[in-house]
Amino acid sequence: MSWDDAIEGVDRDTPGGRMPRAWNVAARLRAANDDISHAHVADGVPTYAELHCLSDFSFLRGASSAEQLFARAQHCGYSALAITDECSLAGIVRGLEASRVTGVRLIVGSEFTLIDGTRFVLLVENAHGYPQVCGLVTTARRAASKGAYRLGRADVEAQFRDVAPGVFALWLPGVQPQAEQGAWLQQVFGERAFLAVELHREQDDGARLQVLQALAQQLGMTAVASGDVHMAQRRERIVQDTLTAIRHTLPLAECGAHLFRNGERHLRTRRALGNIYPDALLQAAVALAQRCTFDISKISYTYPRELVPEGHTPTSYLRQLTEAGIRKRWPGGITAKVREDIEKELALIALKKYEAFFLTVQDVVRFAREQNILCQGRGSSANSAVCYALGITAVNPDETRLLMARFLSEKRDEPPDIDVDFEHERREEVLQYVYRKYGRERAALAATVICYRGKSAVRDVAKAFGLPPDQIALLANCYGWGNGETPMEQRIEEAGFDLANPLINKILLVTEHLRDHPRHLSQHVGGFVISDEPLSLLVPVENAAMADRTIIQWDKDDLETMKLLKVDCLALGMLTCIRKTLDLVRGHRGRDYSIATLPGEDLPTYKMIQRADTVGVFQIESRAQMAMLPRLKPAEFYDLVIEVAIVRPGPIQGDMVHPYLRRRQGREDVSYPSPAVEDILKPTLGVPLFQEQVMELLMHAADYTESEADNLRRSMAAWRRGGDMEQHRMRVRERMQGKGYASTFIDQIFEQIKGFGSYGFPQSHAASFAKLVYASCWLKRHEPAAFACGLLNAQPMGFYSASQIVQDARRGSPERERVEVLPVDVVHSDWDNTLVGGRPWRSAADPGEQPAIRLGMRQVAGLSDVVAQRIVAARTQRAFADIGDLCLRAALDEKACLALAEAGALQGMVGNRNAARWAMAGVEARRPLLPGSPEERPVAFEAPHAGEEILADYRSVGLSLRQHPMALLRPQMRQRRILGLRDLQGRPHGSGVHVAGLVTQRQRPATAKGTIFVTLEDEHGMINVIVWSHLALRRRRALLESRLLAVRGRWERVDGVEHLIAGDLHDLSDLLGDMQLPSRDFH
């Protein structure tokens, strides 16, 4: 269905048959003088500039993007276009970019509605006016909760008191204009106040024009033409109406007066405007637009300077800290190559005036280290020798081939990225330090624009169109399922929808239009913007959803365009796990290590990695990584760098994985077309796996400069978003052919370069992550109890549930010891999981004994840490005499009592769960009685059945230390001739098998073309099941809903990798009864 068809015939095919009647006459309003084909006509048509236009950053109001609006304005021959989103400048940078492309001048502005109903637009005239608008938006947003604003006349008066306004105020009179509102605006802004005449082809246009002109004359205000634009073209009316319904949470049929009467709030042709407005009003709009000379691209920004001590410049102080770091990092002296790199980098930092930025990041890292918060830089900043010297990153330039141009380049306009990971449980301490250090006036988090995706869009659109909830769910599932090889129409028809139904067509049409349409602002994961002056002079600041957080209205792309620097303070769960593990090792095993001092290149650790015994470690814990480990067989640190990077969309799409593996296994010869190429690609056997290699390759083989190579890198990312790489293909081919390289090699390299457009890792980033991979693997191999305990205490994080972590620890492997795990018990447990028993490590010859893990009360569902701390505090004073004593001294309420009883945490005091429930019930019954009342005689209770106990374990603790559920079901599995996973070990490659297990993971990688990877677990271990897309579609319900899944398929064993190719799937969840098991799906 076309757009034109979509907005006709609405009444007859909509639930209830009641839709906005204006849609029925939309076709009649498409007059010839409003046709886009005649839009840009110069003869006899007045010029025009639109002064009141909302983009899609007026969330759920504006229907069109800045790109669409400026393209339409250009086509219509407008001289300027004001983007005036409601109490927001969130979309203004996109407006700037669209203005640059189209040549239509951007006017910066914002629309406001005061508490008393007064509506007006502020248009920025000059550099003095811009911070005034930013400040007013900030005042309004900070006075309300996230997503709202609150502004009164007193706020406006305070903003412009004692200052000369650098703005123009455009009064937007209501349906019944109130002269007092205009008079007040005139009082605040004087002759800078104008009256907007907005006509939309309604029956009373003539009368309204007369009223407004008379009012303007009465008040002595200049009247100007204005459009109250909500969309680029009239055809987007259906989208705008749908957004209105979504905003008001009403079906379209019930929106009534909330909807506009017609589709005239679009960018109309100048001919159409000439037929509606007197020439004087159009000319007044153009004249006002010409007075708005502010260019937002010229705003100035200064980084904080207070970190520079007296007597130093930023340059000299950064030099001093770098030299101190050099002495610490290289106590034996620095190599000539690294010294040269550092000097070159310091000179470039000074040239770009980034010294204060580096000093700020170093200060944040210093604070974290002083607070014993683990942190580590990542990303392209690991290419910086200066960052390594300052202690920000962990990648030693002597050990890894770095390329500074990937991080910092003289010709690159945007600032460098420095991303630092902090422990996820303690990152808030770091964020609040930044707020304290610079104040909330000068520090705020960047925004993230949350956009509609297919599933969220179709839910909102279908609800607006009145579809029943069950049909909305079915339709939404079509967007959350399937792959690019299955047409959307097929998925929708298979779900039972009739594509011939006009209503369904409209829903799908609007849904597609809303894909990637901004929905609201959220906070960036950790990108801080810090300024030497109040941030609200540069960009509006508003409240975040979280307490004690503020965000600016621009996202990271806007910041890059405006050349504002941000510090990324990110959260990483594995750092929390490692820090807690190291603390446990130090306190319980007597081994004092840091990440940097762990023994390197440890053979037993690499043997464990090669067996894919990596549950719970960093990065290489996913099923895809586990499948790669036995094939790649990492044996040294650089192998881990490759392992981290190779299981990514870029290398996969660029067909780099298999050639690398064949060469590594000696099944394919390695050759290089030149010594320069060999020098670059030899570490990865002739296959470019990293972005830095691509850049270096172009610099040596195609004579690219550092800046040109970096520009290609950025083009790769743009190509992923729909950009063009052909200009680079032609340039690369021409230059490489000129240096004698064969066409086949050039084509191969370029296809691999394009693969990086699907997401390729910088080597520096992979090396940073590989440090944590090795640390987590070493700890898992040599201190398995402490590692499992630390991992449990760092939850939630990673791929695996607490149950899987515990099962893995108890199971052990040929490469690591088994760990005993003890249940939660109020007599012994703390809030955290703890280590008990064992014997300290003395030496390699006397490694001691691994301790056991005592599960902590944090594992008990429904129990808070506050309650647990009260229990521990009371127990520390003296042991509990009985249940009543526990409840009295720990001040336990009924909820806490029940949670402990259900978790079996009272076994050390009263025995089994049934006895605990009875005892707790008795305590509750006796609460009103006086202390010292006689105790009832204990009643003997039969222990629950084993199956009941396991069910209760999973329900209350999320894991069980008893028999695995599959062990209880094993007799039934045998009756069905279903094998255990242990039975697969002796089966030859290609054998047909029938197995079943608990579903613990489902994954659908973007590069897998609809293939689903399922992890099954039984009492003996886990296996990976590969479900091809056609079977996934046919057995969709069993695949997605099963807790216990049976699989018939083909067992495969290749290069040490074992998996099951599914041929058929069956849901056996009924055998589990009410047992609910954790499964991490599609993370």
Curated annotation (Swiss-Prot):
CDD domains: DnaE_OBF, PHP_PolIIIA_DnaE2
GO MF terms held by the record: 3'-5' exonuclease activity; DNA-directed DNA polymerase activity; nucleic acid binding
Superkingdom, taxonomy of origin: Bacteria
GO cellular component term of the entry, any: cytoplasm
UniProt EC number: 2.7.7.7
Keywords in alphabetical order: Cytoplasm, DNA damage, DNA repair, DNA replication, DNA-directed DNA polymerase, Nucleotidyltransferase, Transferase
Catalysed transformations (reactions): DNA(n) + a 2'-deoxyribonucleoside 5'-triphosphate = DNA(n+1) + diphosphate
InterPro entries according to UniProt: DNA_pol3_alpha_NTPase_dom, DNA_pol3_finger, DnaE2, DnaE2/DnaE/PolC, DNAPol_HHH, NA-bd_OB_tRNA, PHP_dom, Pol/His_phosphatase_N
GO terms for biological process, alphabetical: DNA repair; DNA replication
Record HAMAP family: DNApol_error_prone
Role noted for this protein: DNA polymerase involved in damage-induced mutagenesis and translesion synthesis (TLS). It is not the major replicative DNA polymerase.
PANTHER family (alphabetical): DNA POLYMERASE III SUBUNIT ALPHA, ERROR-PRONE DNA POLYMERASE
Family per similarity comment: Belongs to the DNA polymerase type-C family. DnaE2 subfamily.
Protein name: Error-prone DNA polymerase
Organism (species): Xanthomonas oryzae pv. oryzae (strain KACC10331 / KXO85)
